[in-house]
Amino acid sequence: MAKGRKLPSVMKNRFSEVPTATIRRSSFDRSHGYKTTFDMDYLVPFFVDEVLPGDTFSLSETHLCRLTTLVQPIMDNIQLTTQFFFVPNRLLWDNWESFITGGDEPVAWTSTNPANEYFVPQVTSPDGGYAENSIYDYFGLPTKVANYRHQVLPLRAYNLIFNEYYRDENLQESLPVWTGDADPKVDPTTGEESQEDDAVPYVYKLMRRNKRYDYFTSALPGLQKGPSVGIGITGGDSGRLPVHGLAIRSYLDDSSDDQFSFGVSYVNASQKWFTADGRLTSGMGSVPVGTTGNFPIDNVVYPSYFGTTVAQTGSPSSSSTPPFVKGDFPVYVDLAASSSVTINSLRNAITLQQWFEKSARYGSRYVESVQGHFGVHLGDYRAQRPIYLGGSKSYVSVNPVVQNSSTDSVSPQGNLSAYALSTDTKHLFTKSFVEHGFVIGLLSATADLTYQQGLERQWSRFSRYDYYWPTFAHLGEQPVYNKEIYCQSDTVMDPSGSAVNDVPFGYQERYAEYRYKPSKVTGLFRSNATGTLDSWHLSQNFANLPTLNETFIQSNTPIDRALAVPDQPDFICDFYFNYRCIRPMPVYSVPGLRRI
């Protein structure tokens, strides 16, 4: 063989290859309608369809939605929103891949044991069946039919979509998304997973969508997402700095307990029971030298500076010249053993504080954290989360109806009522899929947010530091005060003795109030006005001071005051889905022997 030449490999063969599966696809028109009623603010699942690998879906929708008859033609915007997601089955069930493939272990060749087989997680309808207007109803499951089985994956998908796209992680706990072979039972009170005898099946619920973000709803519950960052002062080998008290109060027999601002030992006119550094001496009788802690005087325990509880061994005696004098308690810190903060420690503290502040503002979901800290968008597929496909937005048009028939005291001529509807046609998405899963469509209706009970921040500028200064523009978050959303008398105090008006409701970026202007509601449009006309609008009206929590962040439009019949569903809708599906299957399934 010539130098440098190589012999061909004898292992060149086709045994490491398999033929490519070439599956012909066919197009199907799967257009259909969906008629329903629903209430504002809820996330209603109005579309669900299973997906096969190799599918391509193209979806458009046309709708006619009517709002229940209005008392007056309201002066507010109502927005109808549809949003569609793809949720792979592997995110909803841990054993999906083993189920659909039969398993990737050698036992799959020989096992005939049914225990090794998987079945799709399923639940059974309860006694009395599912109620109308429940999440089960909107998914299309039969209502008022008891004890029939159905799979649970689309319901798990709803909870997962809510957690990933709608939940405010600063204020709301995540919904349970079980991925095992069955949904566990839960405690009927707490909703937590439980193995107790009184545990009940988990009931999936229709969730409210959250309010759109504004000055109040985007407020943060704290200055940063994490512990406050301190600048430490170190001291001595012990890591402690000594604090010395210069005086303590006395206790005389029959003296009132309110003389004490902190506890000491009981006092005898002839003995001193404290050393110079504040520790007990042997004057306590049965109490050893150096004992520290609390002990009762007249059955009242007064805390000491140093630790555990000691027993009382005597009774206080009267004395006109007590060895300890009542008065203030000046103390000082001995900094001789301390060391200063280094510049590097200061840098670390400032940078960590900025990291906590950025995490609070951008969010803590992985995709949000990567986007906020690195400026990189992490695709839904790579983040192992539901994939947003597309959606639509349309406004509800309000049309006045003028009374032009006979006049009476209830409805004179020229009286205005109204009807409202939304009609639109939108292309939603075209998407090809490579794995099994579900397409879930969610429908919701929300109104613009306005407030009418707060004091705009500009009216509370009393100090020059309350005004904008460029020097302070990049300081940390600033408080949004309770009075800005719900103003009360300054005499209303909280348990700590602070005026409730001046207690923080939440926190916003520095000088956020200069960057937006709140809408106003005045005159008889105010809900607290005598003879109010608030049925003309949908501004928020709080019965009590709201708190920045899960209840506040959920959308709760006061639509009932504007409706002629508030106990009926807010909307009645008719949807038509123009739905084209290209699927890896023949146009017709013709029985025969052509494949054998």
Curated annotation (Swiss-Prot):
First-listed, main subcellular location of the protein, grouped into a coarse class: virion
Keywords from the named record: Capsid protein, Host cytoplasm, T=1 icosahedral capsid protein, Virion
Family note: Belongs to the microviridae F protein family.
Magnesium in keyword set: no
Record-level GO cellular component terms: host cell cytoplasm; T=1 icosahedral viral capsid
GO function terms (MF aspect): structural molecule activity
Pfam family membership, one: Phage_F
Places the protein is found: Virion; Host cytoplasm
Record SUPFAM superfamilies: ssDNA viruses (SSF88645)
Protein name: Capsid protein VP1
Native source species: Chlamydia phage 1
Protein task: Assembles to form an icosahedral capsid with a T=1 symmetry.
